């Protein structure tokens, strides 16, 4: 019989609530408590999910002996500190991306995880998307030979508000970081060099905050392969998520996911559904799957499928992209931490 995993959720925003819904459907997982700085506002919602208690102090969850695992869904600025404290409390940890805006803080958090022997999974949910998993399997099985080129298109349907942008860490840390992780995951090689170009073309006011909303990033891998990622904060037709890998024996591509596969053809037009508009619709399956794999890693005492090191490496690429954009030149990952920025 599978031992039940008792969890606590830190942060009851959009992603925290999504995890609560998904965990509630897993028989061998239970949510005991939720922490949110505005605990009173979530009481009725928490009651509807049979949560034992809510609190405004996340440390109450860390001190609860019944809780086995913590889900960190709070703002990025406090992720690393919460990881360290959760590790010290011997709690397994699921942390949303990125681990931190600081590579040093990320390394310190991972050191705490290793020291206390707990499980850490970083929330790069796209690894668990069935379309992208299929691409990964095709590459691993050698069906397209040696991969040489990777193309990722990742475009949001509408830009975030200015208040969000102020604390987001910027396009590369907030949005592109998913694509940086996907690039490593699919190609199976570490990135050695990053060259990023970008501008605030959708909303010029982003530039006043030192951010961009449109970017093209070129990655070079240790094995010599290359990747091109294009990002935009606004694709008016929907949530545009496409991947293509080209290799010595062929190519593999994942197109956009749509509400239906129906295509209407007449003498005047060919029409099909637009891509899903919202990321929670597009990646619904992946959000469910990542939690199942986290629970499996805890139950079997195995490494998670998206480790703390995966979070660190994606963060290093994001940092290099920031530096490349600022200096207008390619940046070596090896030198990322050494560049004054």
From Swiss-Prot:
InterPro entries noted in UniProt? Gfo/Idh/MocA-like_OxRdtase_N, GFO_IDH_MocA-like_dom, Myo_inos_IolG, NAD(P)-bd_dom_sf
- Which Pfam families does this chain map to? GFO_IDH_MocA (PF01408), GFO_IDH_MocA_C3 (PF22725)
- GO MF terms on file? nucleotide binding; oxidoreductase activity
Q: Which domain of life is it from?
A: Bacteria
Sorted alphabetically, the keyword list is: Oxidoreductase
EC number, as in UniProt = 1.-.-.-
- Keyword Oxidoreductase in the entry? The reply is yes
Indicate the family of this protein.
Belongs to the Gfo/Idh/MocA family.
Q: What protein name does the entry list?
A: Uncharacterized oxidoreductase YrbE
Source organism lineage?
A: Bacteria, Bacillati, Bacillota, Bacilli, Bacillales
Q: Which gene encodes it?
A: yrbE
